[in-house]
Amino acid sequence: MKPYQRQFIEFALSKQVLKFGEFTLKSGRKSPYFFNAGLFNTGRDLALLGRFYAEALVDSGIEFDLLFGPAYKGIPIATTTAVALAEHHDRDLPYCFNRKEAKNHGEGGNLVGSPLQGRVMLVDDVITAGTAIRESMEIIQAQGALLAGVLISLDRQERGRGEISAIQEVERDYGCQVISIITLKELIAYLEEKPEMAEHLASVRAYREAYGV
């Protein structure tokens, strides 16, 4: 586990974005942990979040020209990641996001920011069913741009309805790499370092046995 990944887990725990217990997911599964990125909701939270996203992007080595944040949750993520790349990595890159409702006055259209072109890195909080990615792909392809990759905060590494995860489906369908700041693997490695969290470790491991990919 890299230092920024450990720091991200601690940041998520401190903000109660990451919680352990028993949670019922939309899929009906009972999960021993829950991740709600909406609780990163202050200026300082966003500044830190952008640094973690930027770190993961640089670490991945994937080449891209522009950041795209799908409405709505992807918008602040794309913005703060663009700021962090410029401030901490000397990479001043354009960013763009979509509107859910097309505008027919002013500048019009359903895209805001830089022109959507070149190799696009899509940033979002999580991928649950991959629906947001599919909608974004339509927008990206309509502009003649290419999807270079997708970056999310957490990869739960669990099966969807079939034998593979929603993330693996996205990789298969669009031929792109999906990367994340952390995966379930790092989460388990973190729990293994913390004797006081042993009760959670057992339940997370059992969940991975049942639903992991």
UniProtKB/Swiss-Prot annotation:
Protein residues bound to orotate: 34-35, 128, 156
PROSITE patterns from the UniProt entry: PUR_PYR_PR_TRANSFER
Amino acids binding 5-phospho-alpha-D-ribose 1-diphosphate: 26, 72-73, 99-100, 103, 105, 124-132
GO molecular function: magnesium ion binding; orotate phosphoribosyltransferase activity
EC number annotated for this UniProt entry: 2.4.2.10
Residue ranges of the TM segments: none
Pathway membership, UniProt: Pyrimidine metabolism; UMP biosynthesis via de novo pathway; UMP from orotate: step 1/2
Stored InterPro entries: OPRT, Or_phspho_trans_dom, PRibTrfase_dom, PRTase-like
Cofactor(s) listed: Mg(2+)
Gene Ontology CC terms: cytoplasm
Reactions performed catalytically: orotidine 5'-phosphate + diphosphate = orotate + 5-phospho-alpha-D-ribose 1-diphosphate
UniProt keywords, alphabetically: Glycosyltransferase, Magnesium, Pyrimidine biosynthesis, Transferase
The keyword Transferase is annotated on this UniProt entry: yes
Gene Ontology terms describing biological process: 'de novo' pyrimidine nucleobase biosynthetic process; 'de novo' UMP biosynthetic process; pyrimidine ribonucleoside biosynthetic process
Function, in words: Catalyzes the transfer of a ribosyl phosphate group from 5-phosphoribose 1-diphosphate to orotate, leading to the formation of orotidine monophosphate (OMP).
Family, similarity comment: Belongs to the purine/pyrimidine phosphoribosyltransferase family. PyrE subfamily.
Protein name: Orotate phosphoribosyltransferase
Organism listed in the record: Klebsiella pneumoniae subsp. pneumoniae (strain ATCC 700721 / MGH 78578)
Protein encoded by which gene: pyrE
